[in-house]
UniProtKB/Swiss-Prot annotation:
PANTHER family: 50S RIBOSOMAL PROTEIN L36 2, LARGE RIBOSOMAL SUBUNIT PROTEIN BL36B
UniProt-recorded name of the protein: Large ribosomal subunit protein bL36
Annotated keywords: Ribonucleoprotein, Ribosomal protein
One GO term of the biological process aspect: translation
Molecular function GO labels: structural constituent of ribosome
Cross-referenced SUPFAM superfamilies: Ribosomal protein L36
Keyword Ribonucleoprotein: yes
Origin: domain of life: Bacteria
């Protein structure tokens, strides 16, 4: 999982990316292609 400051550009890299908020953190999750996972930090 990558740690990035801005997730907007990462979300547009793949059409199945989902923006999810969990426990005060923002994640990009992708079930079909997990290498696109990222966390804002």
């Amino acid at each position: 999982m990558k740690i990035k400051n801005s997730l907007k550009a990462l979300r547009e890299r793949h059409r199945n990316n989902r923006l999810v908020r969990r426990k005060g953190r923002v994640y990009i999750l992708n079930k079909t292609n997990p290498r696109f996972r990222a966390r804002q930090g």
